[in-house]
Structures are given as C-alpha cells and as structure tokens.
C-alpha cells in the first residue's frame, strides 16, 4: 500500500459521520447502537492509523478537527461504495439479505408503505426494510447524508422538471407517476367548472411551506385565497369542510388513506392537476442488489395503488 494512502475501516467512518451529525460522542454512540467506550475505541484506533487527531475537546464536549471534518464529508460516499461491494458479493453467494432504509412523505404511510412491506416480507423474507416519514426536502437531505437509501417524494406543478432544486444535484431522481389533486367540498355542493368560483370561500391550507401549490393555483384563477385554517392533517381538513367551515385541496393518496367523512365530497380539480411522484436515490444505488429489489417492488406497488383508483 502507498504510504500516502490512509488506512481506515468503514465502521470508523460511520462513527466520524455520526459525531458530525449528532454533535457528541454520546449521541453518536446511541445513534449507532454502540456503547460510548466502543465509540471512543474506534476513534483512538483511527487516530493511531492516520497519525492525526480526529476530535478535540471543547469544554465538556468534543468537536471534529479539520481532519475529522474531511472524513465526515467523504464518509457517505465511501460507506455507500463499501456497502455496494458487500451487497454484490452477497448476491454472488446467492444471499437475499440486507437492510434498506426508506423515507417517504406521510400520506404514503397508510396504504402504500404497508403494501410494500407486506410484499417484501412475502417475496424476500431475508430483506429488512426500515421506514421513516419525512417531507421531500428532508427526505432528499437524508439520501445525500446517507441516512436513507430510497426516498419517495413529490413535487407540484411548476417544479416537476427539477423537483427538489439544487438539493438533488448529484442524486438520481426518477419519475414514479402522479397523484391527482382533488377539491374537497361540503357534501351537496354543485361543484365548479373553475377554481375562480371559490374565490369568496374560506380556504383550509397546509403549513406555509406546504401551501405553495394552492397559492399558485388560486393566483392563476385570479384571486388570493382567504386562508382561515392551517393544518397538514388530512382528516382535520375533511372535518373542517364537513362542518361547512371552508374548502380545500388534497392529494388523492391522502384522501384514499381513510374513509371520506360524512358531509364531504371530493372531485378532481377542473384543471386536472396532479402532483408528481419521484424516487430519489444516490447515484448508482440500483447496483446494490437489495436496493434494486426494493425499487422494483416499490414500482409495482405504486402501479397497483394507481390502478386501484382507476
């Protein structure tokens, strides 16, 4: 080996990255499932191999040195490459095992994710899929920081060509279909031919970060919506509409995740708009057999859910 080539192991890199993410050795140990002495031992072994300090004391805590920050910055790419090697070797041995980390938006949780988990359990019992809910910006960040392997995300009309802006640069973003946007109106409403007919209504909207599509929709219809209630809970949205307190839009996936409440009716937007669904991974992630398997099953389940609606 070239004397200039540093010698380190994957677990040590994961340790350094965990310290960077959590800010302390104690928190890093908890996140990795190790004891604090074990983490300290990883660090001492790594520092001995490299001949440089990785952490330094600051008051009662620690922080990464410049060398530590270099390791933390490159750790996700290096550990992903090592994982890919291990997975491919396992595939050559005929093993169908591994852990794949999925992150997806909340409205995917009630229907799509359980179907995916059940399908994988039946077809690949040795494969473990972990799942965390997150909105698209956080999901993309999880991919970039190697805290997830697959992210299921969405984007609304107007940003579909580059669904997550510069945050997804260097990642792979695949189209995964569409999720129709529905008008949510009180039961018995005669319906509308244009959203402009609802200009005088009170609107129920999501959080400020989540309502951009509604504001754009109303702007194109020539009015600013009067937002009286703010919630990201689809059941709460329908509850407010059922009491005649306002109108709203919801994605079909959210509407289909629970029985429509009495007093509510839904219909596609007159403009037939939908949010785009996307699958985000690191570059070449599909070369890892377990990730490729989950991607294939996820694609089938997305198609099955879409087909059940038609």
Predicted stretch roles:
Residues 112, 264-310:
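A late-sequence structural motif
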Residues 17-33:
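Short helix-boundary/capping micro-motifs
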Residues 162, 166-174, 179, 235-284:
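Beta-alpha-beta core module
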Residues 47-69:
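A short LG(V/I)-centered, amphipathic sequence patch enriched
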Residues 165-203:
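Flexible hinge/capping segments at coil-to-helix
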Residues 154, 184-185, 195, 200-221, ...:
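Secondary-structure junction motif
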Residues 135-140, 144-148, 154, 209-265:
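Hydrophobic hinge/microswitch elements
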Residues 97-161, 231:
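Central regulatory/effector-binding core of bacterial HTH transcription factors
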